[in-house]
Amino acid sequence: QVLLAKRMGKKRIIAETGAGQHGVATATVCALMNMQCIVYMGKTDVERQHINVEKMKMLGAEVRPVTSGNMTLKDATNEAIRDWCCHPADTYYVIGSTVGPHPYPDMVARLQSVISEEIKKQLKEQEGREYPDYLMACVGGGSNAAGTIYHYIDDERVQIVLAEAGGKGIDTGFSAATIQLGKMGIIHGAKTLVIQNEDGQIEEPYSISAGLDYPGIGPMHANLAKQQRALVLAINDDEAIRAAFELTRLEGIIPALESAHALGALDKMRFKPTDIVVLTVSGRGDKDIETYLKESGTRTSLQ
């Protein structure tokens, strides 16, 4: 996207970020390309992901905390779009998920499809075939999930399983399970499923994970769910935390809280011993260590 911005003659790059991973990636490329970089991030997320905030600052980006609304990803996206509308001549907005107005959802999915290309290559080497029986990924806006499934969408042999953020439970009012709770609406220029009240006002989502804390979903995933091409599971905070600790202790891999939701979905599935299951661990857990430490202290069942 930054190469595209350079080709278009833009001088200023803006981005939104929830977990901070997209912000760090954008700041990294801007440092490499010597371009001005401004990252919008909800104040709540700045506090809970401050390691990534410091990385962005080290890379030369300006991080602007957003204090409106719930002070999370939706609000950061609002501010980034507002900035973009005010400075269209010199500014390019690097969207970090399959959300926003066309062509962003399609463009981000295509660029992320390097993930499923890599899955095909690795499966061919490891298993002698290019397709798995199950593909699993977490879904907030839907970028890593889109990349994971991109080359398999039309392959009926592959069961797609998406894990969205159930928060404290989908019936509690503290959730970000958009596919299960959402109704058709428009958010940030995309027609998709949106968590909204009966008046059509967008509800504030909740998730322990900053990257899944979004009241919409990429239109591609809303469509796949409607067509019943994907099985969508809501994974609550407790299930995600437990799965993260399990992976850490069994494999020595500390996953991001977002990815932990995909791991939490494993317990809800029943596989045959011969099934090939590919699960995308979309981020590393360095940024979430403080949350994990806090949660392990309060949840004795994790010990």
Residue map of PLM features:
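Active-site/ligand-binding loops adjacent to catalytic centers
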Residues: 77-107, 129, 154-157, 162-253, ...
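Active-site-proximal loop->helix
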Residues: 2-4, 14-17, 22-80, 171-182, ...
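Claisen-condensing/thiolase-fold acyl-transfer catalytic domains that form or cleave C-C bonds
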Residues: 139-143, 147, 237-300
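A glycine-rich, Thr/Ser-enriched phosphate-binding loop motif common to dinucleotide/cofactor-binding enzymes
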Residues: 103-118, 256-261
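A short, small-residue-rich loop immediately preceding and capping a beta-strand
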Residues: 2-29, 33-42, 130-144, 160-163, ...
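Buried hydrophobic packing segments
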Residues: 1-5, 26-29, 80, 148-152, ...
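Phosphate/pyrophosphate-binding loops at sites that engage ATP/ADP/AMP, CoA/4′-phosphopantetheine
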Residues: 121-130
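Flexible loop/turn segments at secondary-structure boundaries
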Residues: 21-24, 46-48, 73, 101-104, ...
